[in-house]
């Protein structure tokens, strides 16, 4: 193979490479065997036309496109490897020449990984908005949340107050015309929960069972149903019942109802304190890691980030997100319907910080390379085992989904992150 690389601009260039006859001939044979299956030519049974007859009738050139598709991926990868390039986006391939009996000549317009000039990434001093300390108020708040979860709703006489639940029928209209989705029967609405659009729930405070209230509201400008956004609406609302929460007493019996592993309220609080301390420890470590990585990235210099890398990152993140949704049984169509968003909205969401994610990955990769981090066989096996456990899969399934190179890359990246964070100190 003959290869060359011509630099055209920062992180951009053109590879010129050839595909030899030794590679072309077997590819032409494969292409012919594939094509002839569908050929129906008088004088021959379907799929049994001789190669010589095919060449006479159609010309060998008729096989070139199929043959090129067979040999191109391997030839391109070999050219990139021979030149020692780190290509980061799909190439634009052009054919220079494909003549019978001659090596084929092609060019590939490529984008290469930008140069990263590392700054300080060890012994960094960072500030974090997080604490490991757990206050008595935080413990009490957790107990109170669990206590409220055990609250029972009972029907009450009198006016509905904030926090009460009202059982209602409602019919919505705009300019006197009812609209789709604006009607409900026997709907339980907790006042102050924010379930309905702003202004709705507040107008039911003070209402009583048996009353009908005209609730006048304005739909938000960014409301998901565009035909209603920004419009004034009236909901004729009938209150059937008003219910209030009755929470159990704050005592040892409550503690046992919440957690059958404790006997007293003090034991429950002690258990919650440990849980909160553990969660805060993790959150604190995550905050330190995030701040240290952000500072290491800020200290580095990246020469012109290719837009193709950002584009690919947006689509990678979107595909990963939608894949997670589908594993939960939620199709893209269902997700967009439930959230009132579009694919374009999701694209904008991931576009917002795609630059930052790409730069972060580039800097961490550069640190891994600078430190000479590599993955051992034992580390690869442990990574496979950990992933299998995390996603409830068999180890062989993980091996089938992730190549050894991907696993090695991920392990090296984790080591680089550890170098950054383990030496960082908090101001």
UniProtKB/Swiss-Prot annotation:
GO terms for cellular component: cytoplasm. PANTHER family: TRIGGER FACTOR CHAPERONE AND PEPTIDYL-PROLYL CIS/TRANS ISOMERASE, TRIGGER FACTOR-LIKE PROTEIN TIG, CHLOROPLASTIC. Pfam families: FKBP_C, Trigger_C, Trigger_N. It comes from Streptococcus agalactiae serotype III (strain NEM316). One of its GO terms (molecular function) is protein folding chaperone. This is Trigger factor. Disulfide bonds: none annotated. It is found in: Cytoplasm. Involved in protein export. Acts as a chaperone by maintaining the newly synthesized protein in an open conformation. Functions as a peptidyl-prolyl cis-trans isomerase. GO terms for biological process: 'de novo' cotranslational protein folding; cell division; chaperone-mediated protein folding; protein transport; protein unfolding.
């Amino acid at each position: 193979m003959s290869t060359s690389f011509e630099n055209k601009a920062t992180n951009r260039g053109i590879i010129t490479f050839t595909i030899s006859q030794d590679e072309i001939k077997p590819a032409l044979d494969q292409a012919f065997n594939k094509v002839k299956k569908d050929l129906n030519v008088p004088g021959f049974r379907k799929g049994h036309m001789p190669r010589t007859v095919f060449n006479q009738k159609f010309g060998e050139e008729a096989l070139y496109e199929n043959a090129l598709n067979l040999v191109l991926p391997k030839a391109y990868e070999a050219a990139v490897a021979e030149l020692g390039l780190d290509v980061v986006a799909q190439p634009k391939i052009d054919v220079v020449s494909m003549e019978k009996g001659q090596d084929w000549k092609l060019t590939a317009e490529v984008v290469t990984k930008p140069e990263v000039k590392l700054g300080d990434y060890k012994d960094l001093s960072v500030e974090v908005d997080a604490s490991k300390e757990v206050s008595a108020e935080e413990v009490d708040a957790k107990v109170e949340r669990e206590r409220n979860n055990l609250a029972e709703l009972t029907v009450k006489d009198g006016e509905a107050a904030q926090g009460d639940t009202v059982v209602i029928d409602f019919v919505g209209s705009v300019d006197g015309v009812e609209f789709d989705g604006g009607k409900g029967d026997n709907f339980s609405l907790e006042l102050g929960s924010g379930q309905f659009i702003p202004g709705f729930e507040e107008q039911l405070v003070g209402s009583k069972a048996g009353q009908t209230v005209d609730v006048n509201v304005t739909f938000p400008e960014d409301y998901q149903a565009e035909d209603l956004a920004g419009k004034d609406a009236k909901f004729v609302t009938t209150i059937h019942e008003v219910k209030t929460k009755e929470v159990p007493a704050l005592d040892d019996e409550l503690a046992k109802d919440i957690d059958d592993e404790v006997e007293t309220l003090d034991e429950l609080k002690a258990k919650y304190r440990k849980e909160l301390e553990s969660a805060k420890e993790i959150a604190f470590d995550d905050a330190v890691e995030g701040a240290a990585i952000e500072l290491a990235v800020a200290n580095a210099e990246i020469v012109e980030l290719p837009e193709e890398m950002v584009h690919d990152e947006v689509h990678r993140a979107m595909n990963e997100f939608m894949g997670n949704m589908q594993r939960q049984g939620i199709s893209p169509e269902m997700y967009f319907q439930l959230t009132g968003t579009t694919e374009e909205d999701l694209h904008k969401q991931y576009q917002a910080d795609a630059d930052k994610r790409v730069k972060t990955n580039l800097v961490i990769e550069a640190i891994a390379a600078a430190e000479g981090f590599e993955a051992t066989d034992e580390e690869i096996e442990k990574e496979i085992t950990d992933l299998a456990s995390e996603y409830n899969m068999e180890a062989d399934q993980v091996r089938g989904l992730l190549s050894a190179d991907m696993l090695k890359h991920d392990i090296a990246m984790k080591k680089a992150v550890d170098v950054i964070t383990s030496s960082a100190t908090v101001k």
